[in-house]
Amino acid sequence: MAKKSLIYREKKRQKLEQQYHLIRRSSKKEISQIPSLSEKWKIHGKLQSPPRNSAPTRLHRRCFSTGRPRANYRDFGLSGHILREMVHAGLLPGATRSSW
């Protein structure tokens, strides 16, 4: 189980990313449309003004049940070992154990 502080920090980053998403998108669109280099630098400075944690690259997927940051499956939102336990227990409909 991940520390509670790390889980809360990730949730805070998600909120910040949603809050500043439109500002970042509009600034990037302006940069692509303006041909003048000096104006691009001004807009680039405005793009750097939001908090660092509001950048989408700072987000990290975490397991829904344990908060583990590694080996996550996007389709389920679970880490690998929790996914395996749930499939073996029959808790995930449609998921089957592999055998070859």
Curated annotation (Swiss-Prot):
Highest taxon of the lineage: Eukaryota
Q: Where exactly are the transmembrane stretches of this chain?
A: none
Q: Name one GO biological process term.
A: translation
The main location class comes to: plastid
GO MF, one term, reads: rRNA binding
Gene Ontology cellular component list? chloroplast; small ribosomal subunit
Q: Which protein are we looking at?
A: Small ribosomal subunit protein uS14c
Name of the gene this protein is made from: rps14
